[in-house]
């Protein structure tokens, strides 16, 4: 199966590379052929590869999806038809339709001088040297077949640039819409650059506007300069036919701060990868994950926190609630390199299987090559406490309501760690509705009403 999956993408590029390049930018095209050769060599990672042991990637890419290589215009008016409201949260709102930045007939967003939120291709045409400095530099195509595939197929994307010492007062919200009349594969690319002392918060919301089979690959590269602060929230509310493979690469300089949060409320199969590297001392990161899955949904989170230098702090907390026949996986690796003294690293994965048929695979790991560190890791997998359920039923609470309350109390810890208060309040509401079976799609979307 894997060889067939790879062959269809190799054949696709060999027959359509001119078309792909025609509708993209020279900077993106400059690395395309090398990425293709890397994919030819690497292929899709098999389960024999440690970081992919829990999810069969070739099966995800096996179906024959359509691709919009000619960049045909997709009829959609996202601002009028699609809303993803977070009450009391004032955002600068942008849309990405499939894998293209949408800039038609949208209200103009006022941004501080020098801040850029725009099409990656557009900026690459205007300032190719700037894009070439960052594009495909930390997302290395010679190390991962999925990243290589995305790099030789991606034709556009989103650029977010925050200049030195600029602090954004408003959250930048990017709504990624999957829209198609046929089964479709999209390949998104996001480049985020925060210069020294910059501060910004980003909320990425993934939604599907049509009940089609979608495959979305996504590569995010984020450069966080010295003394800069990045808050990144990634929320997925799609449907059971959606396949999502997201690789996030973050590079932190000295005394920088990153708060990374991934929330999966509705999906089909989701595979999230986070690679974060400390390049300067005094940096810190907080990585949180909230997963709710039921039926046959699959959610696989894989993280690598690379302490290349000392005096850095990392904290990870991922929590899963699995119902039905859902399957979850978490593998986290904390890597404390030689000479990275005074490292503090905490990695925790806690999981609740609400049924006997739900399955969770967990593998927290630490590799420590320095002797003056404070590092700990742990994981738990359990079911609802029968004694607690009985206690609540004896006091007039129905079994279903008691189950809901215990699940909500369990997942609440990770939600409360999310610093964006309006989003946190919204998630409390959405998670409760999700547990009650009342939330089938994003309730803020006009298309879903």
What are these regions (language model features)?
Residues 108-118, 126-397, 411, 415-449:
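Conserved beta-strand/loop scaffold segments within soluble protein domains that form the structured core
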Residues 2-148, 317, 323:
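N-terminal amphipathic, basic helical "cap/leader" segment at the start of enzyme domains
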């Amino acid at each position: 199966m894997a060889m067939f999956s790879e062959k269809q993408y190799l054949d696709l590029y060999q027959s359509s590379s001119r078309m792909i390049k025609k509708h993209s930018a020279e900077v993106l095209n400059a690395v395309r052929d090398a990425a293709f050769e890397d994919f030819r060599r690497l292929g899709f990672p098999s389960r024999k590869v440690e970081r992919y042991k829990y999810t069969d990637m070739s099966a995800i890419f096996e179906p024959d999806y359509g691709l919009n290589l000619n960049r045909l215009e997709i009829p959609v008016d996202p601002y009028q038809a699609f809303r993803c409201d977070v009450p009391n949260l004032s955002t600068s709102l942008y849309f990405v339709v499939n894998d293209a930045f949408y800039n038609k007939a949208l209200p103009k967003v006022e941004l501080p001088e020098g801040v850029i939120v725009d099409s990656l291709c557009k900026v690459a045409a205007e300032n190719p040297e700037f894009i070439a400095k960052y594009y495909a530099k930390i997302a290395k195509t010679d190390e991962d077949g999925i990243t290589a595939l995305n790099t030789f197929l991606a034709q556009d994307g989103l650029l977010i640039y925050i200049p030195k010492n600029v602090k954004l007062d408003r959250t930048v919200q990017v709504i990624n819409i999957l829209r198609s009349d046929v089964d479709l594969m999209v390949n998104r690319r996001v480049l985020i650059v925060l210069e020294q002392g910059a501060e910004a918060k980003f909320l990425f919301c993934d939604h599907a506007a049509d009940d089609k089979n979608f495959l979305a690959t996504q590569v995010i590269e984020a450069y966080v300069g010295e003394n800069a602060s990045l808050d990144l929230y990634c929320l997925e509310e799609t449907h059971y036919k959606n396949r999502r493979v997201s690789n996030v690469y973050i590079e932190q300089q000295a005394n920088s701060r990153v708060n990374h949060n991934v929330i999966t409320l509705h999906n089909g199969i989701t595979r999230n990868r986070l690679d974060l590297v400390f390049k300067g001392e005094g940096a810190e990161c907080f990585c949180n994950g909230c997963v709710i899955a039921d039926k046959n949904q699959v959610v696989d989170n894989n993280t690598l926190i690379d302490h290349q230098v000392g005096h850095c702090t990392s904290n990870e907390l991922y929590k899963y609630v699995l119902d039905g026949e859902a399957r979850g996986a978490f593998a986290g690796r904390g890597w404390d390199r030689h000479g990275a003294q005074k490292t503090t690293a905490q990695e925790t994965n806690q999981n609740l299987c609400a049924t006997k048929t739900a399955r969770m695979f967990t593998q927290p790991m630490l590799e420590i090559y320095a002797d003056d560190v404070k590092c700990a890791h742990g994981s738990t997998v359990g079911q609802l406490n029968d004694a607690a359920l009985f206690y609540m039923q004896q006091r007039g609470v129905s079994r279903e309501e008691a189950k809901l309350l215990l699940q909500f109390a369990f997942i609440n810890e990770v939600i409360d760690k999310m610093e964006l208060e309006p989003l946190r309040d919204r998630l409390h509401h959405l998670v409760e509705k999700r547990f009650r079976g009342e939330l089938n799609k994003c309730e803020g979307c006009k298309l879903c009403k």
